[in-house]
């Protein structure tokens, strides 16, 4: 498989156009319709997601991405993390937790705000495995 980086979204934290039809942003111009920030990296046999924007389901479907090995979070803002629950189908498909990488602070906040994704809680099976980035790191396919 070819190595590839796909920008899935490059809009602001509100996306573009805004839900209110923000003035000065002509939504008839295709260049003004942008989903929130995230990216996908296809490297050798790995499928790596950078951030889980609120638009992640649509972004994956539009780009025909059907597999996922890991997620890297740049920081813990809603526009980077709100799509975290959309990772469940990849856990169900692969029957293994998805490793998520981020700084100590980002992982701490993700675990606090999305406890059900990291710990078994009544009605929810943990789907994610936290990986704190200290300096350099590498991602390997889980077998």
Give each language-model segment a name:
Residues 1-143:
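Binuclear metal-dependent hydrolase catalytic cores
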């Amino acid at each position: 498989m070819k190595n590839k980086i796909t920008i899935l979204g490059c809009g602001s934290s509100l996306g573009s156009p805004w839900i209110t039809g923000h003035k000065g942003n002509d939504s008839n111009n295709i260049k003004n319709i942008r989903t929130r920030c995230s990216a996908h990296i296809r490297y050798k046999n790995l499928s790596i997601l950078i951030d889980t924007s609120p638009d992640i389901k649509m972004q994956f479907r539009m780009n025909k991405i059907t597999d996922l090995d890991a997620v890297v979070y740049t920081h813990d803002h809603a526009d980077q993390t709100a799509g975290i629950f959309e990772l469940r189908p990849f856990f169900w498909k692969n029957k293994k937790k998805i490793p998520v990488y981020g700084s100590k602070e980002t992982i701490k906040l993700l675990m606090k705000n999305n406890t059900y994704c990291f710990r078994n809680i009544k009605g929810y099976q943990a789907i994610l495995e936290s990986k704190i980035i200290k300096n350099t790191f590498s991602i390997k396919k889980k077998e």
